[in-house]
């Protein structure tokens, strides 16, 4: 997966999302080093067993037009190299730079921010024209962008069903995209334990606390039975992924724990494409 686009458009968020899903990631890689990088990662490993995500943009100061030639050569060796291009409106980019107070990568040319953005659009146009997908992040927040990367690009092949286990806080609404929704507020709440309060459902202390609760074991067993029975029936559906969402009061302890637990179970059952997304945490 090749991640490119305008500075401030969300490329770093996308790469971090791929990394969280066990892609081997490298950012700001010069195009001319891409062939050697891929060869080094594939050496001794079948092509299908490797997931790579590479960030390429104007910071590398390399000839971006070389990428098309490399992608064609990679395809001949059975390597699928998809190119995602992230962009946003000038207004959105200027606001993001104002909020973060970071310098634009082309500011060393003595350009004001609007001019630097315009120049970067010109330099990255060769990448945009050959992109497999152009993602406009002008109206997306970080959580929405991460979710879109997970569901549309990171979960792999669209000819097989992928599973996304999501956690959320009811006080911020139920995810509109959820196919299954389970209420974890019926479970004991680690929030009331002062030592567990600052932790999340991914931490060992919270896991041990909930693992030792009989109601949690019963709740989990019943959900496992339901999902194991009905998820395989959806393989013949036209959808490419299914979202199973767990909600609790704050989206921090119980819902995160359940999403992670069910994702582990799905992987143990042999589902090839499984991801987690914690809306209030990621």
Swiss-Prot record:
InterPro entries: P-loop_NTPase, RapZ-like, RapZ-like_N, RapZ_C
Protein origin, superkingdom: Bacteria
Binding site for GTP: 57-60
Positions with a binding annotation for ATP: 5-12
GO terms assigned for molecular function: ATP binding; GTP binding
The keyword Transmembrane appears for this protein: no
Alphabetically ordered keywords of this record: ATP-binding, GTP-binding, Nucleotide-binding
Keyword Chaperone assigned: no
The family this protein is said to belong to: Belongs to the RapZ-like family.
Described function: Displays ATPase and GTPase activities.
Protein known as: Nucleotide-binding protein XAC2976
Protein's organism: Xanthomonas axonopodis pv. citri (strain 306)
């Amino acid at each position: 997966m090749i991640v490119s686009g305008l500075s401030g458009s969300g490329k770093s968020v996308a790469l971090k999302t791929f990394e969280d899903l066990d892609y081997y990631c490298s950012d700001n890689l010069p195009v001319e080093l891409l062939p050697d990088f891929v060869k080094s990662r594939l050496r001794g490993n079948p092509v299908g067993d490797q997931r790579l995500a590479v960030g390429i943009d104007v910071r590398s100061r390399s000839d971006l037009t070389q990428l098309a030639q490399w992608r064609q050569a990679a395809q001949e060796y059975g390597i699928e190299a998809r190119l995602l291009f992230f962009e946003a409106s000038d207004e959105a980019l200027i606001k993001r730079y104002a909020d973060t107070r970071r310098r634009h990568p082309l500011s060393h040319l003595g350009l004001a921010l609007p001019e630097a953005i315009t120049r970067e659009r010109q330099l990255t146009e060769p990448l945009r024209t050959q992109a497999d997908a152009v993602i406009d992040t002008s109206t997306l927040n970080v959580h929405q962008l991460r979710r879109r990367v997970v569901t549309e690009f990171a979960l792999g092949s669209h000819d097989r069903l992928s599973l996304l286990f999501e956690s959320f806080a009811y006080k911020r609404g139920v995810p509109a995209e959820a196919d299954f929704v389970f209420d974890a507020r019926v479970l004991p709440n680690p929030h009331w334990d002062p030592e567990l309060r600052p932790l999340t459902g991914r931490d060992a202390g919270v896991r041990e606390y909930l693992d030792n609760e009989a109601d949690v074991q019963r709740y989990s067993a019943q959900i496992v039975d339901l999902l194991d029975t009905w998820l395989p029936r959806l393989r013949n559906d036209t959808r490419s992924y299914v979202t199973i969402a767990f909600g609790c009061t704050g989206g921090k302890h119980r819902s995160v724990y359940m999403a992670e637990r069910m994702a582990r179970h799905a992987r143990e059952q042999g589902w090839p494409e499984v991801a987690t997304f914690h809306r209030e945490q990621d």
